[in-house]
């Protein structure tokens, strides 16, 4: 399976795991809609954690950032998102995440960590 989305059973976290066979051009809209549905159904704000197990090209990073961070219905501006945490070792994604805090992307608050344990620890501090 190219990606997996799960709502934590007890904590207010949604985890998207992006596997190496994920095709952003074909699957981003699908995974975004699934996460949006979970957020719509939530009675409390969620920490949205994305675990990148794949390598993204610069074009994919730019396309992805524009699709999730800009526009009226952008997922990362959903009112039920408390914080976004990215798990990656990619320097390009790390720099892109910093850019998401700009006015162009609506001043998003995106953290980048290196492991799932670190992401869960950070998310639990916010809960």
Report residues per predicted region.
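Amphipathic, Lys/Arg-enriched alpha-helical "gate/interface" segment within cytosolic domains
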Residues: 1-127
């Amino acid at each position: 399976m190219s990606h997996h989305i799960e709502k934590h059973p007890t904590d207010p976290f949604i985890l998207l795991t992006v596997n190496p066979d994920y095709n952003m051009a074909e699957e981003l809209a699908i995974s975004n809609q699934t996460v949006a549905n979970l957020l719509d159904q939530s009675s409390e704000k969620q920490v949205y954690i994305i675990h990148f197990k794949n390598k993204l090209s610069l074009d994919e990073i730019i396309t992805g950032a524009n699709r999730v961070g800009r526009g009226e219905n952008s997922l990362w501006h959903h009112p039920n998102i408390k914080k976004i945490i990215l798990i990656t070792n990619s320097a390009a994604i790390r720099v892109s995440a910093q850019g998401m805090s700009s006015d162009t992307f609506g001043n998003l608050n995106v953290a980048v960590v290196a492991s799932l344990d670190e992401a869960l620890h950070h998310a639990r501090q916010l809960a």
